[in-house]
């Protein structure tokens, strides 16, 4: 694939920077830092452009917080001016990374997403009798900066863009030379791109027809157990040698008819069920919502709004009985 150049000038264009602000501010206009930036928008965008043209981007200003959904994760949110920069970079560079992506990579891509990945997995489960479900141990924390930048250099020949990526990546590490922060736009795209190297190896070297990846969760399907066991050994070696990554121990090598755990669902050839962890998370959130309502913190309208967002996840699976119970209890559309 031909490398792409002359990207940095496009990142610096005033029109691109203004578009980056609009994307960064979408749905966040009520936040103080967004309002402060918007109040002096022309001046702030001019400053950002000057910093980029001087090759002195101001990066590395993060706010850290922890979420539990379901496991504990440290989220690293960039300050708003830096989020504008991230959008400016990805406005121009995302199409370059997109051209490298295979069809069956589903994270951080327009027209893809979690539900499309699950439906594709269901189609493969109907075609192939065996599946191999894998995911990477501490994925974001384990990404090697030097290997990531080397992979980017195979796609991009603009030295200024590569330098800017190196500066952004270098602002965060979990150990020397490793780690991308969870919660940043650039990190999400780069993390998805990093495993694109695995995607091409699976499709072009192993020649696996049934394969789906959503970030660091991926599934291979095949005709028999021995074939997939061989792919497992090869995948371990490839990830270690090429990307410096290791697989989690919870390998799932089983018959497709028994269901594959994928993205919170149990995917069978003919139906979708909620996985046990997703059911537990749903129950905990439901109890929390009921408590807010009973204690008067939420109105019925508040309850309905939160319940709709919660039900959108379970509605995708075969959960008619569960949703009928919700309707009977709360009168919420399911």
Task: Describe the residue ranges of each PLM region.
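Conserved polymerase palm-domain catalytic core
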Residues: 44, 51-55, 59-60, 103-104, ...
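Conserved two-metal-ion catalytic palm core of "right-hand" nucleic acid polymerases
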Residues: 1-157, 172-173
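Gly/Ser/Thr-rich beta-alpha loop segments that engage phosphate groups in nucleotides
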Residues: 34, 181, 185, 266
């Amino acid at each position: 694939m031909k490398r792409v150049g002359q990207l940095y000038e496009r990142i610096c264009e005033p029109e691109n920077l203004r578009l980056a602000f609009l994307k960064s501010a979408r749905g966040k206009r009520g936040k103080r830092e967004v309002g402060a930036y918007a109040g002096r928008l022309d001046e702030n965008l001019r400053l950002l452009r000057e910093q980029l043209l001087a090759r002195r981007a101001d990066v590395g200003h993060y706010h850290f917080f922890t979420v539990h959904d379901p496991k504990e994760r440290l989220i690293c949110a960039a300050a708003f001016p830096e989020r504008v920069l991230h959008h400016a970079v990805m406005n121009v560079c995302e199409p370059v990374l997109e051209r490298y992506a295979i069809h069956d990579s589903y994270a951080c891509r327009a027209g893809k997403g979690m539900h499309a990945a699950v439906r594709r997995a269901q189609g493969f489960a109907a075609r192939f009798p065996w599946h191999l479900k894998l995911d990477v141990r501490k994925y974001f924390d384990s990404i090697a900066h030097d290997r990531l930048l080397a992979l980017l250099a195979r796609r991009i020949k603009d030295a200024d863009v590569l330098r800017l990526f190196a500066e952004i990546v270098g602002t965060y590490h979990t150990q020397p030379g490793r780690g991308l922060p969870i919660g940043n736009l650039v990190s999400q795209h780069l993390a998805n791109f990093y495993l694109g190297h695995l995607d091409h190896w699976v499709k072009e070297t192993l020649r696996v027809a049934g394969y789906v990846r959503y970030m660091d969760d991926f599934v291979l399907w095949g005709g028999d157990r021995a074939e997939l066991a061989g792919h497992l050994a090869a995948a371990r070696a490839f990830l270690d040698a090429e990307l410096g990554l290791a697989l989690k121990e919870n390998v799932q090598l089983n018959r497709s008819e028994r269901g594959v755990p994928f993205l919170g669902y149990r995917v069978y050839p003919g139906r979708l069920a909620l996985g046990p962890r997703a059911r537990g998370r749903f129950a905990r959130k439901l109890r929390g919502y009921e408590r807010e309502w009973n204690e008067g913190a939420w109105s019925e309208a508040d309850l309905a709004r939160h319940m709709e967002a919660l039900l959108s996840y379970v509605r995708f699976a075969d959960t008619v009985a569960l949703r009928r119970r919700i309707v009977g209890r709360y009168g919420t559309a399911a």
